C-alpha cells in the first residue's frame, strides 16, 4: 500500500504533497500553488480526485490525483454559496457537501464523473455550521451547528436534496459547540468533538427503539487546565481501537481508547504537539498520525503504538504558512 499526505496552508495558498513511507517518514513530492486560500480538503471515494475549498472567491476545486505518486493536476471548479469551512463526500462519490461557518449553511454539489458540476441544494439557518458528515450507510448527513449547540440530521435523496429527518436534530449541552465528527467502523456509534468546552460526545446511531442517544460525554483536557478551551478536530483509527482529538489553546492531542463495541471511550493520555493544531489525520494503516500546527507552520508525524494508542513523534516538517488541513490517500 502506498500513501500520500496532503496538507493545506491557506496563508501561503499552497498544498504540499508528501509520500508517507512505511517507517513514518515523509518525502516531499510536490508543492501546488492554489488560486485562493485553501482550507478544507477531501479525497474522492475512488481516490481519483482531491476536492478543496478556497476563499475569498468561494469555490470547490477538483485536482486529479496521479496514481503513481499522488501528484495533483487541476481538473475543474464550481462556485459555492458560502465560505467553505469543511468539505466531504458521500460514499458513492456522487455529491460533495460543504459546510460554511460564516454563511450558516450546508450545500450539496453534484459530481459528474468525479468533477464538480454545480450546487443542487442549500440548507440555510445553521448558525456556525462547522462540518457535514455522511453516515456509514450513506443515508443521513450529520451537520453540527456550533453556535446553536445542535447537530442537524438530513436524509440524502437520490438527487442530492437534503430532507430534514424526524427528529430533525440532536442537541448537546449548552455552550458545548459541536464541531467535527468521526464514525466507528462498526457503524453503530459516532463521536463529536465540541469546540467551546473541549469535550467529546459519543452518539449511539440507533438504539433498539430507533432513537439517537448521547451515551457518554468526556472532558478531553487535563484536570489542571484552566485556560480558554478551543478544540478542533477528531479522528478514529481504521480498526476502531483508538480515537484522537486536539485542542488549539493547549496545543495537545488527547488519546482515547475505544471499547470493542464502540460505546465507551477511556482517556489514556495527552501528546504535546505543534502550536495551535487546527487539523490532523490518521493514515490508512492505523500506524501513524499527522498533525498540522497553524502557528508553527510545521506538520509532525507520530507513531501509534500499544494497547493505549499513545503517540511517539517520528519527525516534523516545514510546510506552507498557517497549515490547517491534513488528508491521507491510500492506493
From Swiss-Prot:
InterPro entries in the record: 6-phosphogluconolactonase_YbhE (IPR022528), Cycloisomerase_2 (IPR050282), Lactonase_7-beta_prop (IPR019405), N2O_reductase_N (IPR011045), WD40/YVTN_repeat-like_dom_sf (IPR015943)
EC code:
3.1.1.31
Pfam families attached to this UniProt entry: Lactonase (PF10282)
Q: Which UniProt keywords apply?
A: Carbohydrate metabolism, Glucose metabolism, Hydrolase
Gene3D superfamilies assigned to the protein according to its UniProt record, in alphabetical order: YVTN repeat-like/Quinoprotein amine dehydrogenase (2.130.10.10)
The kind of enzyme this is, by top-level EC class, is: hydrolase
Q: Which biological process annotations from GO are given for this protein? A: glucose metabolic process; pentose-phosphate shunt, oxidative branch
For whether the record's keyword set contains Hydrolase, the answer is yes
Its function?
A: Catalyzes the hydrolysis of 6-phosphogluconolactone to 6-phosphogluconate.
Family matches, as NCBIfam families = PRK11028.1
Q: What is this protein called?
A: 6-phosphogluconolactonase
- Species for this entry: Citrobacter koseri (strain ATCC BAA-895 / CDC 4225-83 / SGSC4696)
Identify the taxonomic lineage of the organism of origin: Bacteria, Pseudomonadati, Pseudomonadota, Gammaproteobacteria, Enterobacterales
Amino acid at each position: 500500500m502506498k500513501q500520500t499526505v496532503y496538507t493545506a496552508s491557506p496563508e501561503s495558498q499552497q498544498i504540499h504533497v508528501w509520500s508517507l513511507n512505511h517507517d513514518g517518514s515523509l518525502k516531499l513530492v510536490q508543492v501546488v500553488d492554489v488560486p485562493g486560500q485553501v482550507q478544507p480538503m477531501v479525497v474522492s471515494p475512488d481516490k481519483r480526485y482531491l476536492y478543496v475549498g478556497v476563499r475569498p472567491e468561494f469555490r470547490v476545486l477538483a485536482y486529479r490525483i496521479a496514481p503513481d505518486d499522488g501528484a495533483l493536476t487541476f481538473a475543474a471548479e464550481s462556485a459555492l454559496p458560502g465560505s467553505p469551512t469543511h468539505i466531504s463526500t458521500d460514499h458513492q462519490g456522487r455529491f460533495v457537501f460543504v459546510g460554511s461557518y460564516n454563511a450558516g449553511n450546508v450545500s450539496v454539489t453534484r459530481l459528474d464523473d468525479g468533477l464538480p458540476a454545480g450546487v443542487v441544494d442549500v440548507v440555510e439557518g445553521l448558525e456556525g455550521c462547522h462540518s457535514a458528515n455522511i453516515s456509514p450507510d450513506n443515508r443521513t448527513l450529520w451537520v453540527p451547528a456550533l453556535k446553536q449547540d445542535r447537530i442537524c440530521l438530513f436524509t440524502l435523496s437520490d438527487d442530492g436534496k437534503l430532507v430534514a429527518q424526524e427528529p430533525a436534530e440532536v442537541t448537546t449541552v449548552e455552550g458545548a459547540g459541536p464541531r467535527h465528527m468521526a464514525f466507528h467502523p462498526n457503524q453503530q456509534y459516532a463521536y463529536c468533538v465540541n469546540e467551546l468546552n473541549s469535550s467529546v460526545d459519543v452518539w449511539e446511531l440507533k438504539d433498539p427503539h430507533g432513537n439517537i442517544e448521547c451515551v457518554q460525554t468526556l472532558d478531553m483536557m487535563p484536570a489542571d487546565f484552566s485556560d480558554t478551551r478551543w478544540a478542533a478536530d477528531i479522528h478514529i483509527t481504521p480498526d476502531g481501537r483508538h480515537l484522537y482529538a486536539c485542542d488549539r489553546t493547549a496545543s495537545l492531542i488527547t488519546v482515547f481508547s475505544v471499547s470493542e463495541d464502540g460505546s465507551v471511550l477511556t482517556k489514556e493520555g495527552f501528546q504535546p504537539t505543534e502550536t495551535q493544531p487546527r487539523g490532523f489525520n490518521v493514515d490508512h494503516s492505523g500506524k501513524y498520525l499527522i498533525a498540522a500546527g497553524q502557528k508553527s507552520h510545521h506538520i509532525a508525524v507520530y507513531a501509534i503504538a500499544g494497547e493505549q494508542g499513545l503517540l511517539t513523534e517520528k519527525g516534523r516538517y516545514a510546510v506552507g504558512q498557517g497549515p490547517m488541513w491534513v488528508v491521507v490517500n491510500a492506493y
